[in-house]
């Protein structure tokens, strides 16, 4: 019983995080289309372009994980047609393939958006996150520490990608889906 509660709480937190990210990306899309300042519209459009494949891949991969967890909650019965979870699992299995497989989206992200000579979208995004981290709000202290560690990983990976792009694009292609 305890394991089922842990799985359910994990599923709930993933879904709520995805929902918040979806709202944020939708807001950026609105800004990119309707803001009165051309520069702000362009920056929002670039941010949407950068984040859309990340969000698509994350949502579809985690959707598969959540559906699998839902099936596990029911044990052997989850695999049968009685509960309907098996149908959800089958229906969800196609989502990483729709609109370009997650692997193809990852290659496009890295080769066309992450290492973009015309505009350095990723660095502007990182700078905006650093600015958000500078908040001295004590309620966000634990969250900010975790975000800062994740940001360091993102910077390290981005620098690695940019360095490898100069030397071996095959290494970069192999790392795209990670």
Model features per residue range: what roles?
Residues 2-7:
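Short, small-residue-biased leader/transition segments that mark boundaries at the very start
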Residues 10, 14-17, 54, 58-65, ...:
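Charged, amphipathic alpha-helical oligomerization/scaffolding segments
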Residues 16-56, 158-177:
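C-terminal helix-coil-helix/basic helical segment that borders enzyme active sites and/or dimer interfaces
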Residues 24, 46-124:
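Alpha-helix capping/hinge segments and adjacent helical runs
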Residues 15-33, 63-66, 70, 74, ...:
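A generic secondary-structure signal for well-formed alpha-helical elements
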Residues 110-113, 117-176:
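Long, amphipathic alpha-helical stalk/connector segments used for oligomerization, subunit docking
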Residues 22-24, 37-38, 74-77, 81-83, ...:
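Short coil/turn segments at secondary-structure boundaries
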């Amino acid at each position: 019983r305890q394991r089922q509660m842990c799985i359910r709480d994990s599923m709930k937190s993933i879904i709520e995080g995805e929902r918040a990210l979806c709202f944020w990306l939708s807001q950026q899309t609105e800004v990119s289309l309707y803001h009165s300042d051309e520069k702000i519209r362009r920056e929002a459009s670039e941010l949407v372009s950068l984040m859309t494949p990340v969000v698509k891949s994350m949502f579809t991969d985690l959707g598969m994980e959540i559906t699998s967890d839902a099936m596990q909650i029911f044990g052997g019965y989850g695999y049968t047609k009685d509960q309907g979870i098996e149908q959800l699992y089958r229906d969800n299995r196609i989502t990483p393939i729709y609109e370009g497989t997650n692997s193809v989206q990852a290659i496009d992200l890295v080769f066309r958006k992450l290492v973009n000579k015309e505009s350095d979208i990723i660095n502007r995004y990182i700078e905006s996150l650093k600015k958000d981290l500078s908040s001295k709000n004590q309620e966000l202290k634990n969250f900010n520490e975790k975000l800062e560690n994740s940001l360091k990983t993102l910077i390290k990976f981005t620098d690695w990608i940019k360095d490898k792009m100069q030397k071996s694009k095959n290494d970069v292609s192999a790392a795209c889906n990670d």
